[in-house]
Amino acid sequence: MLGLRTCFSPAFYLAVVLSEIKKKVRLIQGIASTYPEEITDVEEGDVCTVFSFPRFYKETVNIAHFMRRRGAKVIIITGKDIRPVKPYGDIIIPCSAVGPSFKDSYVAVHFLIDYIISSIAAKNKDEGIEVVSKIEEILSQNYFIGF
């Protein structure tokens, strides 16, 4: 998953929830501009979901372009104007909800994320059960108070 600046929130949410049902889910965080170190092992067969909304951050499309050149499928979730990001993705999903603020709302984006997660979970039940079992094993090691 990739989402920089204001797009980090939906990317983080998708990565966390998807990692509860799929193995090998990674979030490119780019803390201290460590993008190169985080994407060195991208290869053919990988899929990267990219969140990019206006104002389009150039670093986001640069990273998406690199991953696509390495053979990864790039899915870009963006606003209603897909033209700025269209050259960088294999699949472009426009998703927009105009809000009362100067920025569009991410409500529709989170709805789309929940739909994607539900679809993936339905198609990967066995893997999801295995991943959840491993997560529960770790969490049972005194992570919570009073349970």
What residue spans do the PLM features occupy?
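A short, charged, Gly/Pro-tolerant segment at domain boundaries
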Residues: 126-147
